[in-house]
């Protein structure tokens, strides 16, 4: 009898939460869905999923007698799905099974209605979940997260589900994917295929064409191979007007928030600069001035801290939409994690492809960034474009070109966008790591004599540009004067405290780690530069951003003369073990590979 049910094969990286979503779907779906119970060579009752535990000998016997639909090996265990699942398919029931990417091709060749469900989450979310298990070091967690899974074979239908926020939200998306997959697994080729093929030939697409392609991609009507070809073509031939069309198309998938205010401001940075925690200074200055600034920010992926990681050392950041509205009403601003707020179903699908392939998706990202700013209700956006050897933008020319594109696309969306090119050649501020960066922020807000001047100056520049969005302010220079006065008079610090209180102040603010090690100069000379990638690597080895108190405190300035034994930077950690891991990384660097470069006088 021909199988009529759909077989859903669930795959995804460690930390994505596949088992939790499957459990949630089991409770939500009716009897038309059967959830496979895997046979595993480990005892019944072991930690993890409910399974049938068997011995190695019993597993081998069943395999010889043909009792398995498919088998695979992983983590020194053997896994099998029983052949009896075929009977469920023949009865018209849909089967949901958790499995390995390595057997997708084998199953797809045997099952006429077969859909892969790829569960994903941003790298920072995966890292936090894996780290919470307490079984791996910071470097091991980073290595596991960076590991790219095998691609889904060509022509196999694949639906991507992002499980990045709450279990309830992830389960709802997972259940909808199963329902969508049931409807589309045997459907005809998508109507938007002519648009996709046109892009593969290098032809431009308009807004309607992008909407059609994205709708079919979200519904799982394209294979991963087809979407990969599409994205590769788009990174090569995406014109400026197409970026506008793509940005406008993306806004069709998320309703826009209405703040009922003439000016709602936001900020975005392309990142890549250690420290540089200006958002925690800019937002309270702007709030003190009176403009609404509901700022959502990311956690760190490969750096030592993200804005959300830093803010979380003093206040709650996992805000829901109603929390953001309340904070803006009470304090005129918030600094929240974007994981619960700026979800994009389009990014769920596309990021799962672009990240492992390391595609140059900067132009695509402009559409993504600005479409999310638009749907979040912003009217005016400022963009920080740092350039330097270890940032996403290698040269000033690269940054200027991308800045022009940001402003052009913003205009196409009806947004006022101002892009600023900044120096990203080295760290800004002294602290690198969540609590250390917040210490620098507090020094600036408190007008302390030892506040990092570079951090203060950059924050005032951006705050001035934002304040100048107000039609009553005639220039960015005037805006910067207003910003400096708000900072000097303590109004920015008061606004910062109001924002933290509205979000929920931590009763135990995270302090810099008490396990410390000073790294001294080994030669005489002048500090010529700081390698941002290496210094962030040391901070991560010490535990940042997972441990909020971990990081690096810079004790020398560019251009300063140093002698052997003079402190260059201090490593902070929350444990002796993590401190030793960071120290070992420093020792392994040797003279030719140091975070602080010293040139002879």
Swiss-Prot record:
Cellular component GO terms, alphabetical: cytosol
Signal sequence bounds: none
Entry EC number(s): 2.7.4.23, 2.4.2.4
Region (Thymidinephosphorylase): 178-601
Protein's pathway: Metabolic intermediate biosynthesis; 5-phospho-alpha-D-ribose 1-diphosphate biosynthesis; 5-phospho-alpha-D-ribose 1-diphosphate from D-ribose 5-phosphate (route II): step 3/3
Alphabetized SUPFAM superfamilies for the sequence: Nucleoside phosphorylase/phosphoribosyltransferase catalytic domain (SSF52418), P-loop containing nucleoside triphosphate hydrolases (SSF52540), Pyrimidine nucleoside phosphorylase C-terminal domain (SSF54680)
Substrates-to-products reaction catalysed: alpha-D-ribose 1,5-bisphosphate + ATP = 5-phospho-alpha-D-ribose 1-diphosphate + ADP; thymidine + phosphate = 2-deoxy-alpha-D-ribose 1-phosphate + thymine
SMART domains in the record: PYNP_C
Membership in a protein family: In the N-terminal section; belongs to the ribose 1,5-bisphosphokinase family. In the C-terminal section; belongs to the thymidine/pyrimidine-nucleoside phosphorylase family. Type 2 subfamily.
HAMAP family registered for this protein in UniProt: PhnN, Thymid_phosp_2
Protein's name according to its UniProt entry: Bifunctional ribose 1,5-bisphosphokinase-thymidine phosphorylase
Gene: phnN
